[in-house]
Amino acid sequence: MIALLLNSGRGTRMGAETKEHPKCMCRLDDQDTIISWQVKLLRRVGVKEAVVTTGPFADMLREHLESLNAGITFHYVPNPDYMNTNYIVSMDNARALLEADDVISLHGDLVLAPEVMDMLAAAPVSSVAVDASLPLPEKDFKARLTGGRVSAIGVNVFGEECVASQPAYRFLRKDFCRWMEEIRRFVERGERTCYAENAFNAAWEEIPLYPLDVGGRLCAEIDNPEDQARVCAQFLRTVRSKA
């Protein structure tokens, strides 16, 4: 199993902090950044190789990851056009490194409880984190469920059949390769600023993806300072206090 860590975004909604480092290097507490915590969880489930997409501050991120001495081999894939494209292009750039194994894919601003990573790694089918205990968020991903499978993921996906979702994925190799094929089609025809999930939505019937309900456990993105305060407080209360 290989990890895909998406870190090519600018993180402008974080304000002044991301003018000095990538968003994934925002601190959760005095022990961990977002990405150092992700790396610890990946090692926890036996991942030994990770593809890291980069945008601004690529050298700083590389230095940070290598300083962790995590026992993971990192492959860095830059997106030179990160200012004008979305991570659909970053994923397309990395496709050659992601064809041979099952994939755990995380957005670089995602904070997870250890149990959520354990659930992802153990999932026998391609899965995405959802939380049916939460109200549907306005600004974050929702997943539409059809016949027990995920049929659409997006910010503007609403309805009674939808649940709150986060971009934490476990993909079987064949399913991930099919998604990447559709991503390639999108990029080739110039759809370079949309979410990669748009490509999944276009081919969902051929990509069996199932909801993995995290049941209220921490699984949340940090998009802005308000998110950071809330998620860090939850991290300290529900994760760090148990360590």
What do the PLM-derived regions correspond to, one by one?
Residues 1-19:
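N-terminal nucleotide-binding beta1-loop-alpha1 segment
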Residues 69-141:
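Conserved beta-loop-beta/alpha segment of the NTase-like Rossmann-fold superfamily
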Residues 25, 143-145, 211:
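A structural signal for short hydrophobic beta-strand segments in well-ordered beta-sheet cores
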